[in-house]
C-alpha cells in the first residue's frame, strides 16, 4: 500500500482528491490537513509515502513547508496548484510531480503510475535535502499557532515530550520541527545534545571546572554547554 497525506486549506479540494484516490486499491489515505503546521506534525507521526501538498496556503506555503521537513523522513512531494507558473519552482523544491487544479483523473493516474514504479525499486524514498534557510519557526502554545521570527529565538531545547522554542522574552512554544532540521536550516548553533542557541542573544559564557560551561543570555536565562560543543562555540565568537 502507498500511504498518502493530503494537505490543502480548501475542504472541497481535499474532498475531490480524496474521491479520486479512494478508487485506487493500493492507496491508503492516512490523513488530511488544512495547513502546514498540522501537516508537519502529521508527517512525523503518520510517515506517509506521498504528500499531496497545496502550494498556496495561508501563513506557510507548501513550498516553504518542504524546507521544514526532516530530510530523513521526507516523503515524495506532489504539489497541487491552480497556476502553472509554480511548476518550475515546484521542481526546484525537489517535487516528485505537480498537478494543476482542478485535478484531472487521467493526469493523476500518470502520477500514481510513476509512484508505483518508484515503489517497486524501494519501499521508501527520501528526497534530497533542501538547503534553504528558515526565516521563522512555526510554534504552538497558549491555544494558538504562531510564527516566531529567527531574531526572536533565544534557544531551542529537546525533551521527552518534544522540541520547544524559547523566545527572547522567555516565552516557550512547541514546534514539530526536529533539532536536526533546525540545526541545518537556521543560524542556531548546537551547544548540547539537547540544546541549540542563538548566539546573537549571548551575553556571557560561564566556564566550569569540569570542562563544561553555561551560557548566560541577555534575557537572563541560562543554557548548558557540553564539553563536546564548547570549542565550536568559542570559535563562533572568535576565541
From Swiss-Prot:
The HTH LytTR-type domain, residue ranges: 137-239
Gene3D superfamilies: 3.40.50.2300, LytTr DNA-binding domain
InterPro entries: CheY-like_superfamily, LytR-like, LytTR_DNA-bd_dom, Sig_transdc_resp-reg_receiver
Residues where 4-aspartylphosphate is found: 54
GO biological process: regulation of DNA-templated transcription
Response regulatory domain boundaries: 3-116
S-S bridge residues: none
Stretches of the chain forming a coiled coil according to its record: none
Keyword tags: DNA-binding, Phosphoprotein, Transcription, Transcription regulation, Two-component regulatory system
Record's GO cellular component terms: cytosol; protein-DNA complex
Domain of life where this protein originates: Bacteria
Name assigned to this protein: Transcriptional regulatory protein BtsR
The organism's taxonomic lineage, starting at the top: Bacteria, Pseudomonadati, Pseudomonadota, Gammaproteobacteria, Enterobacterales
